[in-house]
Each structure stands twice: as C-alpha cells, then as structure tokens.
C-alpha cells in the first residue's frame, strides 16, 4: 500500500474582539466550564504522574527522595479502567498502551470520563468536541513536562531550573478553549456558534478553509482567533542570496544581504507606545497608593485598558515590521535569512536604564515568530543565530566570531564603535553599526558566505523606513 504524501499547507489567523454583551456572557459560561474541566484533567494527570514516579523510584532503588502522596482509590479506579480499555484494544487488533511509561492520553480519558459519567466532562455548556480538545491540550502539556523532566536529569546544564509540574488553574477563573469547524461555522458573513442563536458579524475577505476558532480571555475581554488553512504560495527558487537581521531598540530591524542590499527600520513609535503606557501605569499606581502608601497595587479596569491598548498597538507594529522584512526578501530574491538572538537576552541587558527598559518591553520573540510565519509561506528558510560579539567584531576585517564564554571574554577586535550608530573598521572606514552586526550574524550563520566589500554604500547610506504604517515612504540616509 502506497502512502499518500502529506499535503503541504499554510495557516492564516484573523483576530476579532467581542464587544457584544450577550456573546460575552455566552463565552464567560463556556470559559468557566473550560476552567473546571481543565482542573479535573490536571488532577487526574497529576495523580497518575505521582503514582508512576513513585514506581520509578522503587524499581530503580532510588533513595533519599521524597515520595509523592496520591489518591490510592483514584489510582485503583484508573488502573481498573485501563485494563478494560486495553482489553478492548486487543479485541480490535490494536496494540495495548503502556500507561505507566507513556502517561494518560486524551483517548483514554475520554473513555474514562464517559464511563464514570464525570460531571465537568459531560457538562452541556461545552460541546463534546470542545471537551475533547481541552483534554488533548492538557495531556500534551503533561507529556511535554515529562519529556523535559527526563531531559533535565540528563542535561541539567541546558536548564535554568527544574521543570515544574503543571499547576491547577485558579478556581472561579476562566480558561481559553476552541471550537472546531464542525460546531462553529462561517455563513453569510456571520460566525455561528454551538448551542446558541447568537452570531458575530464577519466581513473580512479570506482565502482557504476555516478549520477552528480559538477563544481567549485577554484583559477582561474575549478575543477570537479564526484559523484558516490555505494552499502554500509558490515557493521561490533556491538562490545564492543570503540575508541577516540584527534586532535592536533604535533600529528595530537592520537587514542586509550578501549582495549589497540593506534596509533599516527605525520607527520611533514603538518606544513612544511603551513610554506612554509606562507613564499611565505609574499614574494609576500612584493614584491607588496615595492614601495608603504601603498598600499593594491591584488590577483595575483602567490598568487593563492601558495594557490592552499598548499590546494591540505593539502587535500591529510587529505585523507591519514582519511584512516589511518579507517585502525586502522577495524584492531581493533572498532564499535564506538568519536572525540574531541570544538565549536569555532579556535577563542581563548591558544597557543604561532607559534603553534596558525599552529593550525588555519590545517583544522580539513575537517579531521573530511573525517573520518566520510570513517567510515560510514563500519557502524562505529562517534560522535563529547566536549573536555574541557580533556588535564588537569588524565584519569588513573578517574578525573571528567566538561564542561567548570565560575564555573569549578578553578577545580583541580590529574595529570599534566610533559613536552611537557608527562602527569604525581597522582601515578607518565608518559603517552603520547595526548593519555591521547583521553582517557578522550572517558570517556566524553561514561561515562560507561571501559578501560585498567593494561598494560599501549599503553599509554607509542604507535605505531607511521611518514610518512602518506607511512603508512606501523610504528615504536615503
């Protein structure tokens, strides 16, 4: 039997914010039910983990460890149903499941909750498919935890702390959930939801097949994420054009190719968004504590609105920036892109206080994700590159680029920073400091790369975008 090749697809997400009060009430009921069910599943997964972990300690004669306490009646009941479940699998000619090693999965829990008529799993507020999806999500989280835990004991140097067992959600709080396209549909420019006649207008133009709708609670509001499956766009032919990006505060993106094209994105609005939000947050905190100086700052509708407005504006900024990067790559036939990123780069930032605050509040991980998402649709390979010493080394002098460690701390380089924004090479040539960093990131990611060293206009007088919301306004210098 010949296996069919898996069809390659891409995904598009459209976000909507729910303003309708009736719909908010509808989603609140489901979010409460989702939270209760999530805690039920977490309880069962935690109990089974405690039981199997104790077995592991006993079988491997591991001493000086604290044994976990668990609900023995629940474990006995789970084991009884596991036996029946595996017997049913055998009758169907399927392999039995080793629950001790692999843990609980969504299929077994679906069978188990149906068998014992678990109240939260069979809650009529949630559709059966939504309950199944919540179960799958929690069990996957536990499997990922167990995998990382075993890896932690083998390679502790890779981790900053021991992976934590997934915790319970707060009682009487709300958790996210999602609908499949079987229960939540789009017809006649309206989104129809299960178990209600309420609808939500949907006037966006979209291509592809709607596959699911995620419902997320954010800042006391509900956000919908409609996911569409699309055929991939025509992939670009493999070229020898390589690009690299250096991310920063003043120049959000400094991108250059090995063929002598470059671009700076230096819109200051992102810093303004953060600065305005910080002032508003400080004002609200001050108003809360002015009468009681030692009292704790509490969440409020005012604070939620400030955070919400800031995050929406920043997310829009990041989408626009990712689109500019995509446009640059398509215009210059780029087939591979390296983005500089250091592990834990937001935890030990060697900047002055103002720049450090701006750096930490810029969601670079979100920007990297959006760039990857957009470029992958066109077959452009994107990789993250460790970037230690890329800002200190001289790209034009081909300085060696070690990975940071104690031995490399005293490494000397040919050039130096002349002043803010400029780098001076060994020959005294002044180039843009961020583009020098981008070239070094390229050299680290692709050691055999050859780049333009004769015509340095792309390093000295690059194209610049100063307003991302109007990316056609490109100036020189």
What label would you give each PLM region?
Residues 1-131:
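Gly/serine-rich nucleotide phosphate-binding loop at the start of the catalytic core
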Residues 41, 133-145, 433-445:
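Stable alpha-helical structural segments in soluble proteins, enriched in small hydrophobic residues
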Residues 72-218, 357, 361:
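Acidic carboxylate diad motif detector
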Residues 34, 82, 135-142, 303-306, ...:
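Short amphipathic alpha-helical coiled-coil/interface segments
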């Amino acid at each position: 039997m010949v296996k069919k090749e898996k069809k390659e697809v891409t995904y598009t997400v459209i976000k909507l914010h729910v303003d309708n009060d009736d719909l908010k009430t509808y989603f609140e009921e489901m979010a409460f039910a989702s939270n209760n069910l999530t805690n039920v599943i977490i309880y069962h997964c935690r109990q089974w983990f405690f039981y199997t972990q104790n077995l592991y300690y006993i079988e491997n004669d591991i001493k000086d460890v604290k044994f976990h306490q668990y609900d023995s009646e629940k474990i006995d009941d789970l084991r009884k149903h596991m036996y029946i479940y595996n017997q049913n699998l055998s009758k169907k000619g399927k392999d039995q499941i080793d629950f001790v090693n692999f843990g609980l999965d969504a299929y077994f829990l679906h069978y188990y909750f149906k068998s014992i008529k678990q109240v939260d799993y069979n809650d009529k507020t949630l559709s059966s498919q939504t309950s199944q999806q919540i179960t799958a999500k929690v069990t996957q989280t536990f499997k990922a935890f167990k995998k990382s835990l075993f890896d932690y004991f083998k390679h502790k140097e890779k981790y900053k702390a021991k992976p934590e067992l997934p915790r319970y959600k707060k009682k009487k709080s709300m958790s996210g959930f999602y609908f499949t396209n079987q229960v939540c549909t789009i017809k006649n420019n309206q989104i129809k939801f299960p178990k209600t006649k309420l609808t939500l207008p949907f006037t966006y133009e979209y291509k592809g097949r709607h596959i699911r709708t995620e419902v997320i609670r954010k800042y006391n509001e509900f956000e919908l994420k409609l996911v569409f499956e699309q055929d991939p766009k025509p992939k670009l032919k493999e070229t020898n054009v390589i690009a690299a990006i250096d991310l920063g505060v003043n120049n959000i993106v400094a991108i250059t190719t090995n063929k002598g094209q470059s671009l700076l994105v230096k819109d200051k609005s992102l810093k303004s968004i953060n600065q305005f939000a910080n002032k508003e947050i400080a004002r609200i905190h001050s108003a809360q504590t002015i009468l009681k100086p030692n009292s704790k700052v509490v969440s409020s509708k005012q604070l939620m609105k400030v955070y919400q407005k800031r995050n929406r504006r920043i997310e829009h900024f990041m989408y626009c920036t990712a689109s500019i990067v995509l446009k640059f790559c398509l215009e210059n036939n780029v087939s591979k892109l390296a983005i500089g990123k250091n592990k834990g780069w937001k935890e030990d930032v060697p900047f002055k206080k103002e720049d450090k605050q701006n750096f930490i509040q810029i969601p670079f991980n979100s920007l990297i994700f959006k760039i990857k998402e957009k470029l992958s649709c066109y077959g452009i390979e994107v990789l993250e590159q460790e970037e230690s010493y890329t800002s200190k080394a001289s790209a034009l002098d081909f300085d060696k680029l070690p990975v940071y460690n104690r031995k490399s701390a005293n490494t000397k380089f040919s050039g130096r920073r002349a002043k803010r924004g400029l780098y001076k090479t060994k020959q005294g040539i002044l180039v843009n400091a961020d583009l020098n960093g981008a070239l070094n990131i390229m050299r680290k990611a692709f050691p055999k790369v050859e780049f333009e060293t004769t015509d340095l206009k792309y390093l000295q007088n690059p194209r610049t975008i100063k307003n991302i919301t109007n990316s056609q306004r490109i100036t020189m210098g």
